[in-house]
């Protein structure tokens, strides 16, 4: 459908403290505070983990983010798992929050983010995490992040082709696991600054690329 839904951005590891005005590492309480704002805003429809808390062990940070999400909002959410073990635990959390396994399948509000390694690679861990989600019948969000001029060709058409190939390859695996399982077509392209070697996430070309990829998503 031609409808636009918005989510917040993630995953910040530093924040400007509203009390002191200083830049500092993010903590778990920041996730709670940000989610309260997201939950209250009618123009933000989906919650994406906003920060990577630096005051908890890095191995369990994803679990802490999931806990915050399930405790402080009833909006749809995108989660990221750090391991297959965590993926299974997050699915259990989602089932409890939904009122049971069948209720979660009937009305899933939890999708799991997985990224490819452009061009044309996916990590073993990402594959295993996504397959667990597909087996549970929950949506997977395949987020492809081509970098025009670096991990994808400098041309628009070439970058879109690489992006699409990354997505289709990953989704083919998931459809083999559970045919017809919902998959979100994700795009977060950036552009290579050839002079400074930086990734530009707000260059004009980025929006052209993402618009083209949005059109590709409608094709499927």
Residue spans of the language-model regions?
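Proteins with a high burden of low-complexity, intrinsically disordered sequence enriched in S/T/G/P/A and R
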Residues: 1-4, 20-21, 92, 120-123
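A generic, well-ordered mixed alpha/beta core segment in the N-terminal half of proteins
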Residues: 3, 8-43
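Helix-rich catalytic cores of soluble enzyme domains
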Residues: 26-220
